[in-house]
Amino acid sequence: MHSRLPVPASLCLLLLLPSVLPASMPGGLSPRDVTDPEVQEAAVFAVEEYNARSTNSNYFKALRLVQAESQVVSGAKYYLTMELVKTSCRKTNGNPKGYQEIQNCRLPPRNQQEKLTCHFEVWSRPWLNKTLLTKVTCN
């Protein structure tokens, strides 16, 4: 039995097909909900590592997780865009603060706040119990 759709109409249907299929492809970047627990875990790790590596005398805390994407690699790679702000909590040698403690730190007055937009890449391999911060850029 022949289709009653004219050739141009069936061609249009074929062209529309990719728009109804899932947008992500294996190995490609997929948008993630910023409230997803795995994304939140990667964000916590990124902020803790940022503070551990930073030479700033004060801690920075997360203001907002702006955007998150992930990629299936050997594990999962998270691409996070976050807003950070410098707190009034000073770093002390040998006694680093954890994420929750830092989130409770007070902020300087609004006109004295130092804010950063940071892009983090976090590579998680749970079966190895290993997470790495592979890239950080802040401005």
Curated annotation (Swiss-Prot):
Motif, Secondary area of contact: chain positions: 71-75
Signal peptide from the UniProt entry: 1-22
Cellular component terms per the entry's GO annotation: extracellular exosome
UniProt xrefs under InterPro entries: Cystatin_dom, Cystatin_sf, Prot_inh_cystat_CS
Tissue: Expressed by the venom gland.
Subcellular location: Secreted
Domain Cystatin: 27-127
Pfam family, one: Cystatin
The keyword Iron is assigned to this record: no
Keywords from the named record: Disulfide bond, Protease inhibitor, Secreted, Signal, Thiol protease inhibitor
CDD domains in UniProt: CY
SUPFAM superfamilies in the record: Cystatin/monellin (SSF54403)
Highest rank taxon of the organism: Eukaryota
An example molecular function term from Gene Ontology annotations: cysteine-type endopeptidase inhibitor activity
Site (Reactive site): G27
Keyword Secreted: yes
Disulfide bridge positions per record: C89-C105, C118-C138
Family, as annotated: Belongs to the cystatin family.
The protein's role, per its UniProt record: Inhibits various C1 cysteine proteases including cathepsin L, papain and cathepsin B. This protein has no toxic activity and its function in the venom is unknown. It may play a role as housekeeping or regulatory protein.
The protein's name in its UniProt record: Cystatin-1
Taxonomic source organism: Crotalus adamanteus
